Amino acid sequence: MIFYVHGFNSSKESSTGKMLAEQSGRPVVCLGYDCSRPFKKNLEKLSLEAWKDMDGFDVIVGTSLGGFYACEMARELQTCAVVFNPAMKPKSQLKKFLGGNVNFATGEKWMFTDDILDSYPEELKAPKGLPVKAYASREDEVLPGNGELVQKAFNDFEWVDSGHRVADFRKYIDEIKKYENILGVSPNE
């Protein structure tokens, strides 16, 4: 099963998750979290939602803050992940969003508070002993300098020639499917 976790200030109804499903030709479970809630509550909710649908051939795909959550979920659920521009230092990288925000996907207005910011860890520790593939952009306009942090943290790493947002998953689909079937068994289609 492919799971997708959206980035900051978005939702599970985002176009990115839908694009992943269309381009992979596979069912994708888009998982959502509320950016106005504390990190641990979001992680617990995401992990529980994924656990209910896991079939043993699972990969969690995440973009930006969703990449951060995907790594934390992979560690908690002992499964694979493929992440794109994962937020490596969420506490400092999210600071610029303190105050009023408008959700990109829903248009809903909300407040990002100091208490919520403080609920995030200082940095992402790449899951050790788990198959995790990380991609990072050299031209990340949202998280400048993040790519170098990703490169240092992940053993299975690749640079991409794009901006922060994943505009097309097609060139990554084979890798995502490989991680979904890391045990070498293909689910019947």
Predicted regions and their residues:
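The alpha/beta-hydrolase serine catalytic core
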Residues: 80-189
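Active-site phosphate/pyrophosphate- and oxyanion-stabilizing loops and adjacent acidic/basic residues
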Residues: 18, 71, 148-149
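A general structural motif
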Residues: 25, 55-57, 78, 129-131
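Conserved alpha/beta-hydrolase fold motif
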Residues: 59-60, 81
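Aromatic pocket-lining residues of Rossmann-like dinucleotide-binding sites
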Residues: 73-77
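Short hydrophobic segments within beta-strands
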Residues: 4-8, 61, 135-137
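Active-site catalytic motif of lipid deacylating hydrolases and related acyltransferases
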Residues: 1-54
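Gly/Ala-rich beta-loop-alpha elbow adjacent to hydrolase catalytic centers
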Residues: 61-70
